[in-house]
Amino acid sequence: MTDRMEKKTYQEIASTTQAQTTGAFIDTLNGIRLNELLRRYSVIDCHKTGAEQELLALRDDIKKLIESSRGGATGMHGFIGERVQVSFSNARAAMQGQEKAYMLIDDNGMTDYLRGKTLIQQKACISDKALGLTHVVAHSEKYPIFIQQNGIYQIPRDFYEKYQRFVNMAEETALKLRKEDLRMWKRVQEFKAAVPEAKVEPMVVTYDEIQAGAVNGTIDREMASVEKEYRKQRNAAENACKPTLQEGLKVTACSAALEGLVDGGVSILEHKQERGKIRNFEKEDWKEIGIDTAKGVGKGAVRGAAVYAATNVAHVPAGIASATVTGAFGVIENSSRYIKGECTGKECAIGIADACASAAVSAISTELGRRFIPIPFLGSLIGNAAGTLLYKVAKKPILRFFNSIMNAEPCIA
């Protein structure tokens, strides 16, 4: 009797411990994913803050510029364009976690701003009716060193689209264009002939967007674009850190292997106590060990999948989810024995009560162990082992009391 009780004790401890190990493992995985998600959120929030600060500073700068009427009615948009190009580019870089690349010079000299070490001159002009290219030629003649130092000219985005359309267009194609488009094609070709080495790039905004009456709306749209990118990055972070089928399958496989190993090991120990030494095992013994191992693999797979789904879909704590699965196994096992006629209804009820109580104690003790010993895995396992041992001590009188209630004669008034 004592041997059987000892076997039952270490078997229950091994069973509940490996069950809670699965729960602790899944809980740790979930914690790692959650911590990574929070880390990414923090980084994205910093990116957004940097971008918004850049745009808010731009709005204040533009307000002062307009109030001072710098450049007058015909030239103010040029100064606005410089600031918008610099700030928008830096805000977009901030949203991607990059350093500021643009720096405003603002000295009315050869260079309007820098992009790293690259010199940039902005030409946002319509007075020449040639996309500002006439002003580019004039600047290159005044500052020949600008192109020699690999300087770049930037024109409004809508101007650049027209420039790109005409710059490589063949003459026979151009001759089929409308009169105004043909005129523009000729101006672009004249520009390329005059300064073939000039590099032209688009600004991030159009000519109309940098006018004094429209620039605040332009900044508002960029603010909205920052918010949109912020949401996009948060969604990407959530998708990268969410539970996946692949991870669930890995957890299921690990749980199956663990439970199969534990149940197989327990079965070997039980047979060893009966046979003395492993070399004395008979064919039937190994068959039973194989069956026990296979059952463990099956239960482990079910447990791993169920706990992973419960913690990530229903957000049930891993310890409780694992204990619930253990209790369910106990209910199924005792019900199956009753259906097969291997036990009485009373024995079935007692077995189910025992399984559920054991699972509840395992869940509670595991949670207490995790809280009082905040070391991943170790706290949960120590708590579970201690709880299981205490339950074994208290179980006998509890089951005797439960049994006496079931055997009591009903009182008839």
Describe the predicted segments one by one.
Residues 1-79:
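Interdomain/boundary linker segments immediately adjacent to catalytic/signaling cores
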Residues 120, 127, 156, 206, ...:
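Helix N-cap and loop-to-helix transition residues
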Residues 245-269, 286-339, 345-406:
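Membrane-active amphipathic alpha-helices enriched in small hydrophobic residues
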